[in-house]
């Protein structure tokens, strides 16, 4: 009798990434121990040395698109396009998740929830530097 060929690849098409409960500043993402969960992403996303992590949303500043308890998948990045939704450090250690709007002389960290005020940061303000940590590529919500 003919044997069925094994068409399953030995290499998995997905990889596991950590979902962090928070993004404390000053610690390389690889060293953070506040891992709440694990998510799988397509292996092809990581081509070209791209790195990803997940983050649990705490709070409602990005409601209604993102809700408390949602998981966002982010691509690590140190820059972004204006309009990207990013996790950023403000003043070196406060991590926040906002829409980043780049203007000529300042950056606006825009919450999606109108109950919250946007944060405006002057590009020349050395006391409040904005550092991009990651750009949202996917939202995952448990029903």
State where each predicted segment sits.
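Hydrophobic beta-strand signal
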Residues: 73-74, 87
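Short, Lys/Arg- and Gly-enriched loop/turn segments at beta-strand edges
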Residues: 80-87, 96-98
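SH3/SH3-like beta-barrel fold
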Residues: 88, 109-112
């Amino acid at each position: 009798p003919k044997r069925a060929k094994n068409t399953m690849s030995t290499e998995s098409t997905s990889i596991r990434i950590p979902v962090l409960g928070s993004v404390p500043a000053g610690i390389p993402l690889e060293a953070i121990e506040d891992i709440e969960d694990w998510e799988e992403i397509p292996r092809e996303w990581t081509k070209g040395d791209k790195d990803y992590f997940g983050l649990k949303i705490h709070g409602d500043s990005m409601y209604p698109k993102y809700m408390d308890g949602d998981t966002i998948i982010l691509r690590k990045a140190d820059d972004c396009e204006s309009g990207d939704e990013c996790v950023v450090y403000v003043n070196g250690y406060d991590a926040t998740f906002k829409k980043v709007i780049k203007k000529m002389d300042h950056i606006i960290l825009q919450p999606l929830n109108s109950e919250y005020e946007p944060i405006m940061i002057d590009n020349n303000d050395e006391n409040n530097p904005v550092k991009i940590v990651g750009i949202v590529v996917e939202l995952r919500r448990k029903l």
